[in-house]
């Protein structure tokens, strides 16, 4: 795979992939607020559907409908995409932070669960991803 294929500076979250389909500004604002909540709550591992819905003063089902309408993803898949994008950013921008600690910061208690989720998303492990992006 080419380095450009994994350049996080040019990647979009799944909900951004269909930017050519204009959405109501309220969807964009809603998604932005959800992303902020997920990132802020990752270290404390309080980024589940119930916690996020509660933080937005929504019921779980209402939250599920809104996030799916705005992104085309289930809440779980959307949360995972935000976690992986943040992990990729930390791996590239914070070279002094251990990979295990990047996983913890992104809400993964288990290093192997983090590695497996990262591989599924990016097609390579976090160490390989970091090395690829820091060999510039």
What are the residue ranges of the model-derived segments?
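Append "Primarily bacterial transcriptional regulators
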Residues: 50-59, 63, 67, 101-109, ...
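Basic, amphipathic alpha-helical hairpins
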Residues: 26, 33-47, 67, 71, ...
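Short, Lys/Arg-enriched, Trp-marked, Pro/Gly-tolerant hinge/linker segments that flank
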Residues: 2-33, 56, 69-77, 81
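Coiled-coil-like amphipathic alpha-helices with heptad-repeat character
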Residues: 59-60, 78, 125
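…primarily DNA-binding HTH/wHTH and HhH modules…
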Residues: 6-17, 21, 116-136
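Terminal helix-turn-helix DNA-binding modules in bacterial transcription factors
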Residues: 50, 69-109, 132-136
């Amino acid at each position: 795979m080419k380095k450009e294929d994994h350049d996080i500076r040019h990647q979009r979250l799944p909900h951004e992939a269909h930017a050519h389909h204009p959405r109501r500004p309220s969807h964009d604002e809603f998604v932005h607020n959800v992303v902020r909540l997920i990132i802020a709550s990752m270290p404390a591992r309080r980024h589940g559907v119930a916690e996020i819905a509660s933080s937005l003063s929504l019921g779980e089902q209402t939250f599920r409908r809104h996030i799916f309408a705005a992104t085309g993803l289930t809440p779980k898949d959307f949360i995972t995409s935000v976690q992986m994008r943040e992990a990729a950013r930390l791996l590239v921008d914070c070279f002094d932070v251990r990979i295990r600690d990047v996983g913890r910061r992104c809400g993964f208690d288990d290093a192997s669960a983090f590695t497996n989720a990262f591989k599924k998303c990016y097609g390579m492990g976090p160490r390989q991803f970091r090395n690829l992006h820091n060999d510039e």
